[in-house]
Design a protein with these regions (language model features):
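Intrinsically disordered, low-complexity regions enriched in acidic/Ser/Thr/Pro/Gln residues
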Residues: 1-156, 161-162, 281
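Compositionally biased, low-complexity repeat tracts
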Residues: 8, 232, 273-276
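Glycine-centered flexibility sites
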Residues: 50, 56, 146-150, 167, ...
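N-terminal-biased segments
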Residues: 136-138, 147-186, 255-260
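Feature captures the catalytic cores and cofactor-binding loops of soluble hydro-lyases/lyases
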Residues: 168-257
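Long, low-complexity, intrinsically disordered segments
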Residues: 266-281
Length: 281
Protein backbone atom coordinates (compact mmCIF):
# COMPACT_ATOMS: atom_id res chain seq x y z
CA UNK A 1 0.00 0.00 0.00
CA UNK A 2 3.08 2.23 0.06
CA UNK A 3 6.19 2.42 -2.12
CA UNK A 4 9.71 3.42 -0.98
CA UNK A 5 10.87 6.47 -2.93
CA UNK A 6 14.33 8.03 -2.75
CA UNK A 7 15.02 11.76 -2.67
CA UNK A 8 16.90 14.38 -0.68
CA UNK A 9 16.06 16.39 2.43
CA UNK A 10 16.54 20.12 3.11
CA UNK A 11 20.31 19.61 3.51
CA UNK A 12 20.71 17.65 0.30
CA UNK A 13 21.22 14.38 2.17
CA UNK A 14 19.70 11.27 0.54
CA UNK A 15 16.47 9.95 2.08
CA UNK A 16 14.08 7.09 1.41
CA UNK A 17 10.43 7.76 2.16
CA UNK A 18 7.37 5.47 2.08
CA UNK A 19 4.85 7.04 -0.30
CA UNK A 20 1.20 6.00 -0.58
CA UNK A 21 0.45 3.85 -3.63
CA UNK A 22 -2.39 5.21 -5.77
CA UNK A 23 -4.10 3.04 -8.36
CA UNK A 24 -7.32 3.12 -10.39
CA UNK A 25 -10.11 0.63 -9.74
CA UNK A 26 -13.16 0.33 -11.98
CA UNK A 27 -16.41 -0.71 -10.33
CA UNK A 28 -19.07 -2.69 -12.18
CA UNK A 29 -22.60 -3.42 -10.99
CA UNK A 30 -23.61 -6.57 -12.80
CA UNK A 31 -22.73 -5.90 -16.47
CA UNK A 32 -22.57 -2.12 -16.25
CA UNK A 33 -19.40 -0.10 -15.70
CA UNK A 34 -20.24 2.56 -13.12
CA UNK A 35 -17.13 4.48 -12.08
CA UNK A 36 -13.33 4.46 -11.98
CA UNK A 37 -11.87 5.76 -8.74
CA UNK A 38 -8.33 6.30 -7.48
CA UNK A 39 -7.69 4.27 -4.35
CA UNK A 40 -4.96 2.61 -2.31
CA UNK A 41 -6.26 -0.80 -3.38
CA UNK A 42 -7.29 -2.51 -0.15
CA UNK A 43 -10.79 -3.80 0.75
CA UNK A 44 -12.00 -3.80 -2.89
CA UNK A 45 -15.25 -5.68 -2.20
CA UNK A 46 -16.20 -3.37 0.66
CA UNK A 47 -15.33 -0.30 -1.42
CA UNK A 48 -17.52 -1.40 -4.32
CA UNK A 49 -20.51 -2.44 -2.22
CA UNK A 50 -20.29 0.70 -0.10
CA UNK A 51 -20.06 2.95 -3.15
CA UNK A 52 -23.16 1.38 -4.71
CA UNK A 53 -25.06 1.63 -1.43
CA UNK A 54 -24.18 5.29 -0.95
CA UNK A 55 -25.13 6.07 -4.56
CA UNK A 56 -28.51 4.37 -4.01
CA UNK A 57 -27.68 1.77 -6.66
CA UNK A 58 -27.85 -1.06 -4.13
CA UNK A 59 -30.77 -1.44 -1.73
CA UNK A 60 -30.56 -2.74 1.82
CA UNK A 61 -32.62 -5.78 0.83
CA UNK A 62 -30.58 -6.62 -2.28
CA UNK A 63 -29.08 -10.09 -2.49
CA UNK A 64 -25.45 -10.04 -3.60
CA UNK A 65 -24.79 -13.24 -5.53
CA UNK A 66 -21.09 -12.67 -6.07
CA UNK A 67 -18.18 -10.22 -5.97
CA UNK A 68 -15.28 -10.65 -8.39
CA UNK A 69 -12.01 -8.75 -8.02
CA UNK A 70 -9.24 -8.81 -10.63
CA UNK A 71 -6.28 -6.99 -9.10
CA UNK A 72 -4.24 -7.05 -12.32
CA UNK A 73 -7.03 -5.43 -14.34
CA UNK A 74 -8.11 -3.17 -11.48
CA UNK A 75 -11.74 -4.25 -11.71
CA UNK A 76 -14.40 -5.15 -9.12
CA UNK A 77 -17.73 -6.63 -10.26
CA UNK A 78 -20.66 -6.82 -7.84
CA UNK A 79 -23.41 -9.19 -8.95
CA UNK A 80 -26.96 -9.06 -7.61
CA UNK A 81 -30.07 -11.20 -7.94
CA UNK A 82 -31.99 -8.08 -8.98
CA UNK A 83 -31.42 -6.76 -12.49
CA UNK A 84 -30.02 -3.21 -12.53
CA UNK A 85 -29.75 -0.47 -15.16
CA UNK A 86 -28.30 2.91 -14.28
CA UNK A 87 -27.52 4.35 -17.71
CA UNK A 88 -29.66 7.46 -17.11
CA UNK A 89 -28.21 8.00 -13.65
CA UNK A 90 -24.63 7.90 -14.93
CA UNK A 91 -25.31 10.82 -17.30
CA UNK A 92 -25.77 13.36 -14.50
CA UNK A 93 -22.77 14.12 -12.33
CA UNK A 94 -22.47 16.91 -9.78
CA UNK A 95 -19.17 16.39 -8.03
CA UNK A 96 -18.84 17.03 -4.32
CA UNK A 97 -15.83 18.54 -2.55
CA UNK A 98 -14.46 15.10 -1.62
CA UNK A 99 -10.91 14.22 -2.62
CA UNK A 100 -10.06 12.19 -5.73
CA UNK A 101 -13.04 10.90 -7.74
CA UNK A 102 -15.83 12.34 -5.61
CA UNK A 103 -19.46 11.33 -5.81
CA UNK A 104 -22.67 12.42 -7.48
CA UNK A 105 -24.45 14.75 -5.05
CA UNK A 106 -27.90 14.36 -6.60
CA UNK A 107 -27.79 10.57 -6.46
CA UNK A 108 -26.83 10.56 -2.79
CA UNK A 109 -29.76 12.84 -1.89
CA UNK A 110 -32.45 10.58 -3.37
CA UNK A 111 -33.42 8.91 -0.06
CA UNK A 112 -32.09 11.51 2.35
CA UNK A 113 -35.39 13.09 3.44
CA UNK A 114 -36.98 9.68 4.11
CA UNK A 115 -34.34 8.40 6.55
CA UNK A 116 -35.11 8.55 10.27
CA UNK A 117 -32.18 8.22 12.65
CA UNK A 118 -32.59 6.52 16.02
CA UNK A 119 -33.82 9.22 18.45
CA UNK A 120 -32.82 7.11 21.48
CA UNK A 121 -29.15 6.77 20.53
CA UNK A 122 -26.74 8.33 23.03
CA UNK A 123 -23.21 9.72 22.84
CA UNK A 124 -21.17 10.04 26.03
CA UNK A 125 -18.63 12.86 26.05
CA UNK A 126 -16.39 10.61 28.15
CA UNK A 127 -15.93 8.34 25.12
CA UNK A 128 -13.86 10.92 23.24
CA UNK A 129 -10.55 10.48 25.07
CA UNK A 130 -10.32 6.67 24.76
CA UNK A 131 -11.60 6.82 21.18
CA UNK A 132 -9.08 9.48 20.16
CA UNK A 133 -6.21 7.63 21.83
CA UNK A 134 -7.14 4.33 20.22
CA UNK A 135 -7.51 5.88 16.77
CA UNK A 136 -4.34 7.97 16.94
CA UNK A 137 -2.17 5.05 18.06
CA UNK A 138 -3.63 2.32 15.82
CA UNK A 139 -1.31 0.79 13.20
CA UNK A 140 -2.07 2.81 10.09
CA UNK A 141 -0.82 3.89 6.71
CA UNK A 142 -1.16 7.48 7.91
CA UNK A 143 1.49 6.96 10.60
CA UNK A 144 3.95 5.41 8.15
CA UNK A 145 3.33 7.39 4.96
CA UNK A 146 0.78 10.19 5.57
CA UNK A 147 -1.29 11.61 2.68
CA UNK A 148 -4.30 9.58 3.76
CA UNK A 149 -7.78 9.94 5.29
CA UNK A 150 -9.15 7.68 8.00
CA UNK A 151 -12.68 6.72 9.08
CA UNK A 152 -13.63 4.59 12.06
CA UNK A 153 -16.86 2.82 12.96
CA UNK A 154 -17.31 2.76 16.73
CA UNK A 155 -19.68 1.28 19.27
CA UNK A 156 -19.52 3.34 22.42
CA UNK A 157 -15.85 3.91 23.21
CA UNK A 158 -14.84 0.80 21.25
CA UNK A 159 -13.63 1.09 17.65
CA UNK A 160 -14.94 -1.72 15.45
CA UNK A 161 -13.12 -1.15 12.16
CA UNK A 162 -10.73 1.48 10.78
CA UNK A 163 -10.54 2.22 7.04
CA UNK A 164 -8.12 4.50 5.21
CA UNK A 165 -7.83 5.86 1.67
CA UNK A 166 -6.49 8.81 -0.32
CA UNK A 167 -10.05 10.11 -0.62
CA UNK A 168 -12.22 10.25 2.48
CA UNK A 169 -15.26 9.25 0.39
CA UNK A 170 -13.50 5.94 -0.37
CA UNK A 171 -12.85 5.33 3.33
CA UNK A 172 -16.53 6.01 4.10
CA UNK A 173 -17.68 3.68 1.34
CA UNK A 174 -15.44 0.89 2.65
CA UNK A 175 -17.10 1.15 6.04
CA UNK A 176 -20.58 1.16 4.46
CA UNK A 177 -19.66 -1.96 2.51
CA UNK A 178 -18.13 -3.63 5.56
CA UNK A 179 -21.30 -3.01 7.57
CA UNK A 180 -23.51 -4.42 4.80
CA UNK A 181 -21.41 -7.54 4.19
CA UNK A 182 -21.05 -8.25 7.92
CA UNK A 183 -24.68 -7.39 8.75
CA UNK A 184 -23.68 -4.77 11.33
CA UNK A 185 -26.61 -2.75 12.70
CA UNK A 186 -26.05 1.04 12.59
CA UNK A 187 -28.47 2.31 15.23
CA UNK A 188 -26.09 2.47 18.21
CA UNK A 189 -22.91 3.28 16.31
CA UNK A 190 -20.65 6.35 16.12
CA UNK A 191 -18.85 7.37 12.93
CA UNK A 192 -15.45 9.04 13.41
CA UNK A 193 -13.57 10.74 10.58
CA UNK A 194 -10.21 12.47 10.51
CA UNK A 195 -11.37 14.88 7.80
CA UNK A 196 -13.59 17.94 7.71
CA UNK A 197 -17.34 17.66 8.13
CA UNK A 198 -18.77 18.33 4.67
CA UNK A 199 -22.17 17.69 3.08
CA UNK A 200 -20.84 14.45 1.63
CA UNK A 201 -19.82 13.16 5.06
CA UNK A 202 -23.21 14.07 6.54
CA UNK A 203 -25.20 12.54 3.69
CA UNK A 204 -23.28 9.26 3.73
CA UNK A 205 -23.48 8.97 7.52
CA UNK A 206 -27.24 9.51 7.38
CA UNK A 207 -27.56 7.00 4.53
CA UNK A 208 -25.76 4.44 6.69
CA UNK A 209 -28.30 5.36 9.44
CA UNK A 210 -25.53 6.10 11.94
CA UNK A 211 -26.86 8.73 14.40
CA UNK A 212 -23.57 10.35 15.48
CA UNK A 213 -20.73 11.80 13.35
CA UNK A 214 -17.51 12.98 15.00
CA UNK A 215 -14.39 14.67 13.60
CA UNK A 216 -11.30 16.33 14.97
CA UNK A 217 -11.64 18.80 12.09
CA UNK A 218 -14.16 21.57 11.41
CA UNK A 219 -17.53 22.02 9.70
CA UNK A 220 -19.02 23.54 6.59
CA UNK A 221 -22.24 25.55 6.98
CA UNK A 222 -24.08 23.37 4.47
CA UNK A 223 -23.09 20.24 6.40
CA UNK A 224 -24.47 21.70 9.63
CA UNK A 225 -27.75 22.60 7.92
CA UNK A 226 -28.13 19.08 6.51
CA UNK A 227 -27.26 17.47 9.85
CA UNK A 228 -29.94 19.52 11.62
CA UNK A 229 -32.46 18.62 8.93
CA UNK A 230 -31.70 14.91 9.33
CA UNK A 231 -31.49 14.86 13.12
CA UNK A 232 -27.82 13.81 13.01
CA UNK A 233 -25.57 14.56 15.98
CA UNK A 234 -22.63 16.47 14.47
CA UNK A 235 -19.52 16.89 16.62
CA UNK A 236 -16.39 18.64 15.37
CA UNK A 237 -13.06 19.99 16.60
CA UNK A 238 -12.87 16.99 18.92
CA UNK A 239 -9.46 17.08 20.62
CA UNK A 240 -8.94 15.68 24.09
CA UNK A 241 -11.97 16.62 26.18
CA UNK A 242 -12.87 19.55 23.95
CA UNK A 243 -15.45 19.46 21.17
CA UNK A 244 -18.16 21.52 19.53
CA UNK A 245 -21.59 20.10 18.65
CA UNK A 246 -23.53 22.09 16.06
CA UNK A 247 -26.41 19.65 15.56
CA UNK A 248 -28.19 16.93 17.54
CA UNK A 249 -26.70 17.92 20.90
CA UNK A 250 -29.73 16.41 22.69
CA UNK A 251 -28.13 12.96 22.22
CA UNK A 252 -25.01 13.93 24.18
CA UNK A 253 -24.43 12.98 27.82
CA UNK A 254 -21.95 15.51 29.21
CA UNK A 255 -20.15 13.09 31.55
CA UNK A 256 -16.55 14.08 30.90
CA UNK A 257 -13.88 11.95 32.50
CA UNK A 258 -10.58 10.50 31.41
CA UNK A 259 -12.43 7.37 30.30
CA UNK A 260 -10.61 4.25 29.21
CA UNK A 261 -7.01 3.56 28.32
CA UNK A 262 -7.42 3.44 24.57
CA UNK A 263 -6.56 -0.28 24.51
CA UNK A 264 -9.98 -1.05 23.00
CA UNK A 265 -8.41 -1.14 19.54
CA UNK A 266 -6.63 -4.37 20.39
CA UNK A 267 -9.93 -6.16 19.76
CA UNK A 268 -10.85 -4.22 16.61
CA UNK A 269 -9.75 -5.15 13.09
CA UNK A 270 -6.61 -3.03 12.93
CA UNK A 271 -5.33 -1.97 9.55
CA UNK A 272 -2.34 -4.26 9.89
CA UNK A 273 -4.41 -7.38 10.55
CA UNK A 274 -7.10 -6.33 8.09
CA UNK A 275 -4.55 -6.04 5.30
CA UNK A 276 -3.13 -9.45 6.13
CA UNK A 277 -6.62 -10.87 5.74
CA UNK A 278 -7.16 -8.90 2.55
CA UNK A 279 -4.02 -10.37 1.03
CA UNK A 280 -5.39 -13.84 1.65
CA UNK A 281 -8.63 -13.30 -0.26
Amino acid sequence: LSTPVTGVDQTGAPVTLPVVTEKPVTLFLNRQEIVTSMTIGDWPAELAVGYFLNQNMLRADDEITGIDHDEDLGVVIVRTARETDFEAKMKRKIRTSGCAEGTAYGDMMERFADIRLDPDARFHASWLIPLSKAINTAPSLYLSAGAIHGCVLCEGARPLVYMEDIGRHNAVDKIAGWMFLNKVAPQNKVFYTTGRLTTEMVIKTVQMQIPVLVSRSGFTAAAVELAREAGLTLIGRAKGKRFIALAGEDRIDFDQSDGGSGDEFRDAPSLQRARQGEAGR
